[in-house]
Amino acid sequence: IYASGVAGIQVLRKNRELLQGKRCAVLAVGASPADPATIETVRKLNLKEDLAAIPFFYARGAWDLQKMSFADRTLCKMLQKSVAKKDPASLEPWEQALLEAAGGTADWTDREYLQPLLRWIRQGE
């Protein structure tokens, strides 16, 4: 997930006719905590119209500022400075994650995030 956009959604849209009748799901990975309201917002923004019925799963990932492009690093640093000025009690989950990772790396990966997707896969076997 990058700025509420899920990488690869365009591939689904472009190939939706080829995928008709096949089981497919979306696993989105991002830095934000698994907040149900945020996840639902991302799902609705990305899986619209004929993609709305595709199952959507979320897993929290990792953050490494050094692996980002110069433009992304610069944008994230500016955003972190802006968010740091806010009242901590008013921060959204993604803003808290942004500050938590400030200036370096963070790894929030956990195999448990994959369990809902794995259950969905096993149901179709």
Task: Mark where each language-model region is.
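FMN-binding flavodoxin-like domain, especially the glycine-rich phosphate-binding loop
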Residues: 3-125
